[in-house]
Amino acid sequence: MSIFCLAAYFWLTMVGGVMADNPERYSANLSSHMEDFTPFPGTEINFLGTTHRPPNLALPSNGSMHGYCPQQTKITTAFKYINTVISCTIFIVGMVGNATLLRIIYQNKCMRNGPNALIASLALGDLIYVVIDLPINVFKLLAGRWPFDHNDFGVFLCKLFPFLQKSSVGITVLNLCALSVDRYRAVASWSRVQGIGIPLITAIEIVSIWILSFILAIPEAIGFVMVPFEYKGELHRTCMLNATSKFMEFYQDVKDWWLFGFYFCMPLVCTAIFYTLMTCEMLNRRNGSLRIALSEHLKQRREVAKTVFCLVVIFALCWFPLHLSRILKKTVYDEMDKNRCELLSFLLLMDYIGINLATMNSCINPIALYFVSKKFKNCFQSCLCCCCHQSKSLMTSVPMNGTSIQWKNQEQNNHNTERSSHKDSMN
């Protein structure tokens, strides 16, 4: 419940903060439209236009063409800083939360199993996005231009940014699918108690997920380039998708539908299918004595299934507004419509909400695990308390023959914690 309240808070924050067009805001999302990279106000191309422009594009400065809204729009300073604060909060929470989650799974042997390995893979993908992509987002928001836009490093960032962006989302989507399949396998073989350790098939799945995510993101690295264009008599450069081959033109035409189908619908359909099969298995297999003997084991598996389902629901809530905005823009918008600017205002509002909710998905999974899973909650608390205890011990410990009593006690406490955590490890 706390997770949904947090999401609602950010939603209302963005509704209240959106004042006008945001030409400087590079969207941390699945879209690669030209408007997301153009830092210049006053043109409709900033929001809808097209992702393909010739290298020597000249934009009219009088706004008289049908493709431009008559009134120049600009973003308020307050809205800039609201978005900056939100991005910085997501950066801190995402970095601390995902790094702590990885540390918990790495340091506790009892946590090294199939489901937790997939959750660690999910956290690592989110951590990469938070550490690398979010700082670029904040820079574009405040500076109103692409970083290092006049040298080779800017070109490198122009290709790296969308590549990592799409790879991170692919890692999230495929890990959620793998978790759903893993939960079905666990229930289908519910009489088998899994030991500690990562199964070989799970390790193969994780490697395949990362390789496939990188492969699917290659068109982003190929298509995005620094494109010079003239605006109000000045030559500028911006990072955008510039289709120069038939394949890239095809990719550009079907991109919105491809993103919606593969990166959004697929994990939801996969979860629905395998959770339906899992429910049927649990209803059909009711062996009385064996079921009683494994009742505690089944409770643990149900808790893991509930955790995975919660992660999928959060993913859907965070990404749906953004995909809805892109699909509406693809199907409803008409350049020749005289009332298109009113539609743009509505779609822009949805775009901002979707962008921030989608970005928030990179930091919310550790929070969800804290509230949904008792074992992860205990591990998070133990990890944080351990860090505080270590800091205090370093200041108060008394050396004895080159050692410290506190370190010995801490080692004993860690051994007891690991032994107690082994009793309720996820299966």
From Swiss-Prot:
GO terms for molecular function: endothelin receptor activity; G protein-coupled receptor activity. Receptor for endothelin-1. Mediates its action by association with G proteins that activate a phosphatidylinositol-calcium second messenger system. The rank order of binding affinities for ET-A is: ET1 > ET2 >> ET3. Residues 408-427 are annotated as: Disordered. This is Endothelin-1 receptor. It comes from Mus musculus (Mouse). Residues 1-20 form the signal peptide. Its main location: membrane. The keyword Signal applies.
